[in-house]
Regions:
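Glycine-rich phosphate/diphosphate-binding loop of Rossmann-like nucleotide-binding domains
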Residues: 48, 52, 56-152
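Phosphate/diphosphate ligand-binding glycine-rich loop within oxidoreductases
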Residues: 10-53
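Short acidic, glycine/serine/threonine-rich loops at helix termini
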Residues: 8-10, 31-37, 57-63, 89-99, ...
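Short, ordered loop/turn segments at secondary-structure junctions
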Residues: 3, 25-28, 49-52, 109-111, ...
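Adenosine-phosphate binding glycine-rich loop
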Residues: 49-50, 69, 172-284
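General beta-strand structural signal in soluble alpha/beta enzymes
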Residues: 22-25, 46-49, 80, 106, ...
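Long hydrophobic segments that form regular secondary structure
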Residues: 133-190, 222
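Short, small-residue-biased leader/transition segments that mark boundaries at the very start
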Residues: 1-7
């Protein structure tokens, strides 16, 4: 509690000199209360990037990966490995976009988060499943359409990927070592649609694609907060940008001839100069 108050007091002390504040590297569950209180007490936008930046970019990736796979978000089964700030916020935004709570299974270090457990905080209770037939990641992932990993490296095996539904979506976002390597996932099955947090593989989920331009849109309109509608607008702006022809400067930066929307490119690159106008304008509206 003392450290939470210290962070809040320091942020409030500097707030009058800034138009917005981006919070970074505050662990769960403290981050939820710190952000909530600051949003209540300040009249400028406050956003915890580890939560909402990751959520927005991964949601844009999910929207597009589902299109490539020919699936609808309200129908897919989603397994989330990790229950920290990023995982919780990503999953909440997936729900805002149409994912159904009953189709989501979340796991923490103790296994499946179920309603039978008595050790859950408020954030975890929201995602607790009624299912009693699954306890481990290996059991939960069978037949799943989507895997979101925000946990630790090398916890997702090739056999687990093979047990997923056709054209599985695998977002292995642990850094620097993902839950499964790009090479191992592709070797397990060629139809996997994969994203990581790394720049040396296709479809990097990188917060820098979002937060600078989200704040630009909020500042341009003198918004007092970044609300759910603004986040969803950013999701769709980023997702739509990946479907447009890619500028030569982006192709050149990645030493490719012609990036185009599909399995290996469904998230815009961080160097794309169109992000500032597309995302900030969408947020401002």
């Amino acid at each position: 509690v003392g450290s939470e108050m210290c962070i809040r007091d320091r942020v409030k002390a500097i707030a009058p000199t800034f138009g917005g504040i981006n919070l970074e590297d505050i662990k769960a569950p403290e981050c939820f209360e710190i952000e909530r209180r600051l949003k209540e007490e300040l009249d400028i936008p406050v956003m915890h990037d580890d939560q909402h930046g990751t959520a927005i970019i991964s949601s844009a990736g999910l929207v597009n990966a589902l299109q490539v796979a020919g699936k609808k978000i309200e129908d897919v089964k989603i397994v989330v490995n990790g229950a920290g700030a990023s995982a919780v916020s990503c999953t909440k935004l997936y729900v805002s976009l149409g994912a159904r709570l009953e189709n989501i299974v979340m796991l923490d270090s103790k296994g499946v988060i179920s309603k039978t457990r008595t050790d859950l905080n408020e954030q975890k209770r929201y995602f607790a499943t009624d299912r009693t037939d699954i306890h481990t990641l290996e059991e939960a992932i069978k037949g799943a359409d989507v895997f979101l990993g925000l946990s630790k490296g090398n916890v997702l095996s090739q056999d687990m990927v093979r047990s997923m539904a056709p054209m599985p979506i695998v977002f292995a976002l642990a850094n620097p070592t993902p839950e499964i390597s790009y090479e191992d996932a592709m070797a397990a099955r060629p139809d996997v649609l994969m994203a990581t947090g790394r720049s040396d593989y296709p479809n990097q989920i990188n917060n820098v694609i979002g937060f600078p331009y989200i704040f630009r849109g909020a500042l341009d309109t003198q918004a007092k907060a970044i609300n759910e509608e603004m986040k969803i607008a950013a999701v769709h702006a980023i997702a739509n940008l990946a479907k447009q022809p890619v500028p030569d400067v982006v192709n050149a930066a990645y030493h490719v001839n012609n990036l185009s929307f599909g399995a290996e490119y469904f998230i815009p690159k961080p160097v794309d100069p169109r992000l500032i106008t597309e995302v900030s304008c969408a947020v401002a509206k």
